From Swiss-Prot:
Compositional bias ranges of the Polar residues kind: 618-628
Stated name of the protein: HDA1 complex subunit 3
Assembly behavior: Probable component of some histone deacetylase complex.
Membership in a protein family: Belongs to the HDA2/3 family. HDA3 subfamily.
Stated role: Required for activity of histone deacetylase complexes that are responsible for the deacetylation of lysine residues on the N-terminal part of the core histones (H2A, H2B, H3 and H4). Histone deacetylation gives a tag for epigenetic repression and plays an important role in transcriptional regulation, cell cycle progression and developmental events.
Length: 637
């Protein structure tokens, strides 16, 4: 932080207020950078939608269409819209000379594409940093255009797919290096070992960073340097890229719901496609210098808002949007438009009408001719509504019905009336069905009530009978209890009389009862002992059986051990024999090596002798011809 500069200079006012702009403080590492559109891109987007007008209505309002044709048409519309959002040149499917891309093309690319203008401003900031930048885009012409744009920056370009558009590049080395990687690759892409990425820029916002070839690069950077590389997705606001980026978070890209939501939003939002909100315009007017602080410290929160939410539009919204003509202006500032329109109104001649001689648009002609999808026979309003316009109402004819002009207001009014009538018919049919159901339910409840009443009467009568029986049983038990008490009293009297006659009779009677109780206890214990003895006998039998099985298993194991020992002994004998054979072979090889060494030494001695002989030989010298004289042999030296 330069404190002297801060204290010596006046404070710079903030470009925008982050609180009013809706900055959420995102630090996820995957950020969205909205981009505008130029006027040509907006008009091309509207033309693409107009080309697929009938297929869009079939896709959203009917279900009896040929799925392969209409679905392919919708996918073609989405693809062309994506190409236009990136750059209009991508619609050219014939050969484009690569030499054309190198002739002052960076400026022209930025003029005809809002996204490339944002990329140019962003790369002008990134090129000031000594870091490696990864740019991911579609392969082919998109990468050619991106490389042509980067030729206007002071960066080193490393293209990892296809052939570079400029084969003879200068040897100048810059601090910033850009790696161009395709969004779809058949094989993994390997960067240099010392490459340390500082930023990833996705020109195609639908790039899946979880793709194997991209994930391998990012995972390698995270393993090597222990940090996540931040990713910036450049997407045109309110375009198909914006819709795909928003709906791709919650829906699978291969489902019908995803295609329906993206197509509907693209059609409805085409009147505001590429139009930045007022809060963001100062940032882009100053060439994205608002992002310098974040580029200095990428760990800081992203200073721009998150992806703006996109509404889920219905088929009615799509049809209403298709019936509305879209007009674009070169200037997006509403205040300046107001001043411009005011000046035009002041200079307008008084004799000129409101409409002037402006030509009737395509959609107005379709409405005037009653040629729209809900009226395939082109019938007038009298036939459609069944209301005759021959009768007068308060002395005047109904203008809308008599004119035969189908306006938006009349269409909406008729549609709302038909919708209300349909809802009322559905409600009446529902009430009729409910009335029949209620009658059937009432009859069933009535039958159930009679059944329950009958069951209740039976239960009450049964309860009364049971109460009577209980009273009788209680009375009988009480009588028997009284009889027992009388008998016990008689027995005690008799025992007293017998005890009076015979001394000790009562004591004998008590001893007899006690002996009987003791005998019963002994019998119970004896039965328990017998059960325990039988259980122990069974356990002994099981134990003997288990011991016999264990002995058999032990015998079998001993046999297996003896067999294994015999096999081991055989293997040892075989190993000894093989070892002896190997020793003999190694000895033979050592003898051969010794012989060959002796032969090599002999050859070396011969070679030394030959070299000495060659050194002793004298060679003649020859003078090179000079000054036009012939060379002469001077003999040997």
């Amino acid at each position: 932080m330069d404190l002297l500069k801060i204290l010596d200079t006046a404070p710079e006012p903030a470009i925008v207020d982050a609180r009013t702009m809706g900055v959420s403080g995102d630090t996820s590492g995957d950020y969205w950078l909205p981009a505008p559109m130029c006027l040509y891109q907006k008009e091309l987007t509207d033309q693409i939608v107009s080309l697929h007008y009938s297929d869009i209505l079939k896709y959203f309002e009917t279900s009896d269409y040929k799925e392969d044709i209409v679905l392919q048409s919708m996918k073609t519309m989405c693809l062309n819209s994506q190409l236009v959002a990136t750059h209009p040149y991508l619609l050219i499917d014939h050969f484009m000379p690569k030499s054309l891309l190198t002739k002052d093309i960076p400026g022209h690319l930025s003029e005809t594409s809002g996204k490339f203008c944002v990329l140019r401003d962003l790369m002008n900031l990134v090129q000031e940093y000594a870091m490696e930048t990864l740019l991911v885009c579609r392969p082919g012409r998109t990468m050619d255009l991106l490389e042509a744009l980067l030729l206007g920056n002071k960066v080193n370009i490393r293209r990892h797919d296809g052939q570079s558009i400029k084969t003879k590049q200068k040897k100048t080395r810059y601090a910033c290096t850009c790696h161009l990687v395709p969004s779809e690759a058949a094989k993994a892409i390997a960067l240099e070992r010392d490459t340390r990425l500082g930023l990833v820029i996705c020109v195609d916002p639908t790039v899946d960073t979880r793709a194997p070839h991209i994930q391998s690069i990012l995972a390698q950077q995270q393993r090597k340097y222990g940090r996540t590389v931040p990713t910036i997705r450049v997407a045109v606001i309110n375009s198909i890229e914006h819709c795909e980026l928003f709906f791709g978070k919650t829906l699978d890209r291969n489902t019908r719901d995803y295609l329906v939501n993206v197509s509907a939003a693209m059609v409805v939002l085409r009147d505001v496609v590429g139009t930045l909100p007022p809060d963001l315009r100062p940032i882009y007017s100053q060439n994205l210098r608002y992002l310098i602080d974040w580029l200095d410290t990428p760990e800081r929160p992203w200073p721009l808002p998150d992806v703006y939410p996109v509404k889920v539009y219905t088929a009615m919204d799509v049809e209403r949007s298709l019936l509305t003509e879209v007009k674009y202006s070169q200037n997006n500032d509403s205040l300046e438009d107001a001043f411009t329109n005011g000046k035009k109104r002041n200079h307008r001649s008084h004799g000129q009408g409101n409409g002037g001689n402006a030509p009737i648009s395509y959609y107005q002609i379709k409405r005037l001719k009653n040629d729209y999808i809900g009226n395939p026979l082109k019938q007038d309003m009298e036939q459609l509504t069944g209301i005759s316009n021959n009768k007068c109402k308060d002395g005047l004819l109904d203008y809308h019905l008599s004119s035969g002009t189908l306006t938006h207001k009349l269409l909406q009014a008729i549609g709302s009336v038909y919708e209300n009538l349909q809802l009322q018919d559905v409600e009446l049919s529902h009430f009729a069905a409910v009335e029949q159901n209620q009658t059937a339910i009432f009859e069933s409840h009535k039958e159930a009530l009679s059944t329950i009443k009958k069951q209740l009467e039976d239960a009450i009568s049964k309860k009364q009978r049971n109460n009577t029986l209980v009273d009788e049983y209680l009375k009988n038990s009480q009588n028997e209890r009284d009889q027992l008490e009388v008998l016990e009293a008689d027995i005690s009297d008799l025992l007293g009389q017998l005890d009076g006659r015979h001394q000790g009779f009562k004591q004998l009677w008590d001893d007899l009862n006690q002996t009987e109780n003791t005998l019963a206890l002994y019998r119970t214990n004896a039965n328990a002992k017998r059960s325990e003895a039988s259980y122990m006998e069974e356990e002994l039998i099981r134990a003997e059986k288990s011991v016999a099985e264990s002995e058999n298993e032990q015998t079998q194991l001993l046999r297996d051990v003896e067999h294994l020992e015999a096999l081991i002994q055989d293997c040892r004998e075989k190993d000894k024999q093989q070892q002896q054979v190997i020793k003999n072979k190694s000895k033979d090889m050592e003898d051969d090596i010794t012989q060959k060494k002796e032969a090599v030494l002999a050859l070396q001695n011969q070679l030394g002798t030959i070299m000495e002989y060659l050194k002793q030989l004298q060679t003649p010298r020859v003078r090179s011809p000079s000054n036009g004289h012939r060379s002469k042999h001077r003999g040997y030296v």
